[in-house]
Amino acid sequence: MAMAMALRKLSSSVNKSSRPLFSASSLYYKSSLPDEAVYDKENPRVTWPKQLNSPLEVIDPEIADIIELEKARQWKGLELIPSENFTSLSVMQAVGSVMTNKYSEGYPGARYYGGNEYIDMAETLCQKRALEAFRLDPAKWGVNVQPLSGSPSNFQVYTALLKPHDRIMALDLPHGGHLSHGYQTDTKKISAVSIFFETMPYRLDESTGYIDYDQLEKSATLFRPKLIVAGASAYARLYDYARIRKVCDKQKAVLLADMAHISGLVAAGVIPSPFDYADVVTTTTHKSLRGPRGAMIFFRKGLKEVNKQGKEVFYDYEDKINQAVFPGLQGGPHNHTITGLAVALKQATTPEYRAYQEQVLSNSSKFAKALSEKGYDLVSGGTENHLVLVNLKNKGIDGSRVEKVLELVHIAANKNTVPGDVSAMVPGGIRMGTPALTSRGFVEEDFVKVAEYFDAAVSLALKVKAESKGTKLKDFVEALQTSSYVQSEISKLKHDVEEFAKQFPTIGFEKATMKYNK
């Protein structure tokens, strides 16, 4: 009885006339739709599509104005932070595209969501281009392009290849290393890496400013690490990957090269590549590589060796690393970032990109020379990459105070620890780099001028320090804010810096479209 009633109801429903969704020839019908067009602007069925398709300046003028202010800052200032760059318009277009809308947990061809045909295409193309950019054989190397940033990518490698409380060696943070390599003090585990793994630093030879490889080898013999990191955030010299490879082989340790800072230089082939020696290579994608904010993990695959028994031994990194990324430590990847990265990696294989990276090195060398000629003490005595690390102690001032003055005159640099510092809270150095300004078209002679502005800021900082009523940083800041003479000098230097910087092109946006373009 119930079945018969259900069938009669279904038959009645089927026999009802249906109106087309768009037109009489449309394949899609639905009886409940009104006669007028669904997206009739004058008589909309719903109101939110209009809001969703309105531009930012209409929907949120406050945020739009903040973005315009940031554009003006980038145009009028000198960006010297070595971990920053100006990515291209095409990369930003990809990052701001509809690719941000899609969820895609899993990997190409093996997703936990439907509708990923084009997401798979973008990620696969990104992987292909990543291997091509670094001239890698896809039979010997693989790459995961899903890590959200550099620190997570390093932790994903540790999680994949180590057991809890296994041992890691890496360059000490005050000597140029990075937090994600397991930094800790005598009293506190600063990085979470040092909570889950046992870490020991290797350091520079303070008499030369170069990594002390002899001491590294001795420490490794005693510590017996399972993994050694070759990578830095404030080391102006090239790594001796071959030397660390020998130490790793002796200890049967994994060699992880973290090339976050230098990957653009490596891609262009203007400095030695870690891929000849490393087992795993990580990198961020937004520093010298000049892509969107993300990261990659490269790993060896295929035949590793033939053992003493004549048996072939293969690398087992691929599955372990992929599983550590997802589902181990991440959910859905950021597909808009991966798409933007694919664009950046295509750019990284062009002649223009190599010319840019060559200029980055030339500018860095000239900048270092100009600073040295002005009496500045450079850690290691110079540079072989994109950055310089200035030890300010011989000038009688520290990085924190100089950074405050630089900020006020529109020069962006960052305070940094240098060998011999007793506190990371009062670092003795300033870290500066050339990638961002080189993207804007700066050449060697321009960095001589930048060195002059830096020197003027340091001189001003010394005057402020002399006028300070106390020895603490807050006393210095108070003098900055209250001295009419200091305010006048800052205003003059800021004006000179801005007029100089405004001569150069903007990257990613046109001056003519800026709200604050005066």
UniProtKB/Swiss-Prot annotation:
Family statement drawn from the similarity comment of this UniProt entry: Belongs to the SHMT family.
Cellular localization per UniProt: Mitochondrion
Gene Ontology terms: biological process: glycine biosynthetic process from serine; tetrahydrofolate interconversion
Keywords (A to Z) from UniProt: Mitochondrion, One-carbon metabolism, Pyridoxal phosphate, Transferase, Transit peptide
Broad class of the protein's primary localization: mitochondrion
Protein name: Serine hydroxymethyltransferase, mitochondrial
Classification via InterPro entries: PyrdxlP-dep_Trfase, PyrdxlP-dep_Trfase_major, PyrdxlP-dep_Trfase_small, Ser_HO-MeTrfase, Ser_HO-MeTrfase-like, Ser_HO-MeTrfase_PLP_BS, SHMT-like_dom
Annotated NCBIfam families: PRK00011.1
PANTHER family in the record: SERINE HYDROXYMETHYLTRANSFERASE, SERINE HYDROXYMETHYLTRANSFERASE 1, MITOCHONDRIAL
Gene3D superfamilies listed in its UniProt record: Aspartate Aminotransferase, domain 1, Type I PLP-dependent aspartate aminotransferase-like (Major domain)
Organism: Pisum sativum (Garden pea)
